[in-house]
């Protein structure tokens, strides 16, 4: 009988350090079959819209995501079957024609701002983490990331943050903190929290042997 993979949900606000926490877990288990799947990969296809319409999309709202597809593909991985994960093109604001083949793993980290918002997704998780970071730090990180990696202007980033990102955080993301098993202040720099999480994952892996 095939053992079920450990599924770890990692959430928090945009620019809050979710990816860094996820990578800290990944790097602690170099000999395990472990991967990270980003909720951002499942933004809905918008190829039927004009570019002008796409840029107005609220990417911090639950309806922006094809969470049904993510749940479907996670269940496939749980059953031991590979999946083709979509790739999102941030410069065109729609789904790319490419996909990435993902084979089943022993540990799957599910990372994204709204991965604890949907109960069906939460029910698949063994460990749920919320990375809790101050608003000021998150906006600075978001500006740096979006200008360097997504070719965004400073004005557009600030406008999106004040009109969409911040209000959506308080409406949809922050309330999911109550579902977390562990809340991590300071993100990846919280060594005690990271060590506790890695110890728990190692314990579950050992029990499954």
Curated annotation (Swiss-Prot):
Localization of this protein: Cytoplasm
GO cellular component terms, A-Z: cytoplasm
EC number of the protein: 2.7.1.48
Signal sequence annotation: none
SUPFAM superfamilies xref list: P-loop containing nucleoside triphosphate hydrolases (SSF52540)
Reaction(s) the record says it catalyses: uridine + ATP = UMP + ADP + H(+); cytidine + ATP = CMP + ADP + H(+)
Pathway where it operates: Pyrimidine metabolism; CTP biosynthesis via salvage pathway; CTP from cytidine: step 1/3; Pyrimidine metabolism; UMP biosynthesis via salvage pathway; UMP from uridine: step 1/1
The protein's name in its UniProt record: Uridine kinase
Gene field: udk
């Amino acid at each position: 009988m095939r053992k079920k993979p450990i599924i770890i949900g990692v959430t928090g606000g945009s620019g809050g350090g979710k990816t860094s926490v996820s990578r800290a877990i990944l790097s602690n288990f170099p000999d395990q079959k472990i991967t990270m799947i980003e909720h951002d990969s499942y933004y809905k296809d918008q190829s039927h819209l004009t570019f002008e319409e796409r840029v107005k999309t609220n990417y911090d709202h639950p309806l922006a995501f094809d969470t049904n597809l993510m749940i479907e593909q996670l269940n496939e991985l749980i059953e031991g079957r590979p999946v083709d994960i979509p790739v999102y093109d941030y410069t065109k604001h729609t789904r790319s024609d490419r996909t990435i083949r993902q084979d089943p793993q022993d540990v799957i980290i599910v990372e994204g701002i709204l991965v604890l918002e949907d109960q069906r997704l939460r029910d698949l998780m063994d460990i749920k983490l919320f990375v809790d970071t101050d608003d000021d730090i998150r906006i600075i990180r978001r500006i740096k990331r979006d200008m360097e990696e997504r070719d965004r202007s400073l004005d557009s980033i600030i406008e999106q943050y004040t009109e969409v990102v911040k209000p959506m955080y308080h409406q949809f993301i922050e309330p999911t903190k109550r579902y977390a098993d562990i809340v991590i202040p300071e993100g990846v720099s919280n060594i005690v929290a990271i060590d506790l999480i890695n110890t728990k994952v190692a314990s579950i892996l050992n029990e499954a042997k």
